Each structure stands twice: as C-alpha cells, then as structure tokens.
Amino acid sequence: MQTFDLEAQGLRALNTALHAQPGSTNQTIWEILNPKRAHALAVGLDAPIEVNIKGSTGYYCAGMNKQATVHVHGSVGPGTAENMMSGTVIVEGDASQYAGATGNGGTLIIKGNASSRCGISMKGIDIVVKGSVGHNSAFMAQAGHLVVRGDAEDGLGDSLYEAVIYVAGRTGKLRADCQAQELTCLLYTPDPATSPTLFA
C-alpha cells in the first residue's frame, strides 16, 4: 500500500503520482492522510487503482474519474465525481452541491445526504444516495439512474430526458417532464453479500 501525507507532501505531488500510474501498475492501493478539505483531490485518474482518502475533501474530488475506485472517509465539497466516466466513488459522509454532475458512467455512492443539483445533467452515471437529496436534483438528467433512499426536495427531475429516478421517501414538487409512477416490478435485487457497499 502507498501512503501519502497530503499535508507534508502537497496536492500537486499527489495528483502527479496518481496520474503516473499505468493500467498495469502494481501500486494499486493508496491511502491519503490529512486531506483537510483540499480541493481537486484524485481528479482525472485513469488506472485501476483504489484511493482511500482519510478525511473530508473540498471541491471536485474524484472529478473525471476513469477506472479507479475513490473512497472518501468523510464528507465532500461541491462537484464530487463531476464528469465521471467509469469506476466507483464512495463517500462515507455527506456531499455538497452537484455531486455526479454530467457523469457519463461509473457509480457514485453517497452514504449521507446530497445537497442541491445532485446528478445535474447526468449522462449515464449511476448515483445511490443513502440519505436525502436537495432541490433540483437530476435536472436535465439524460441517462443513468438516481436512487434516493431518503427524500427529494422540490424540482426533482426538471427537464428530465431518459434517466430513471427511484425515491424511497417523499418528493417535493416535481418539475417539467418528471412524472411520478408506482414501482410495480423490481428487475434487480442487489445481494448484500455481493454488493456490501450499498448496504453498509
């Protein structure tokens, strides 16, 4: 395991080291200490590595992610997993505004709540929020799935295209092109044994 102290070594050195990892790297597990809400942590990754961030982050954590798994053991600032292409981003705490914005693929799991505009303009990403989401979530969502185990505030799905939204709790006022329907058939039931991150 590669251990990196962000306070001592700096953000530029961290992202440079992560970007240098080839697809065949043996340095597959990274632990980042003392993030102290730094911005742009682990952005633009493109290798099958696992990055564990031990604390909360600022803006744009794990943006433009490809292949990598980024696990934040804390909360995240605005724009987490923005324009994500593939891989997995897991947030143990809460997420600020526009988490998963414009995401094209991959999976974003938020175990707390997500603020406003979660999944705005999503284009294929799958987002699971264990808590609730703020106003205007999935605005102009074009493809992908938003699963909310809590409540959704006003403006959910405004100008929705072909994305699918599931809400276990209550919803506020729905906007244009978003229609409420009863769930009549669940095609896929995740197994807690094989998908533990969804149930932890």
Where would I find each of the regions flagged by the language model?
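Conserved small/polar residues in nucleotide/adenosyl-binding loops
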Residues: 188-194
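The right-handed parallel beta-helix/beta-solenoid scaffold, focusing on the short coil/turn
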Residues: 28-30, 39-41, 47-49, 59-61, ...
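Long, low-complexity, mixed-charge
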Residues: 1-61, 136-138, 149, 155-157, ...
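Feature marks extracellular polysaccharide-active and adherence modules
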Residues: 33, 54-56, 63-64, 73-75, ...
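C-terminal binding/interaction regions
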Residues: 184
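Thiamine diphosphate
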Residues: 115-123, 133-142, 152-161, 168-180
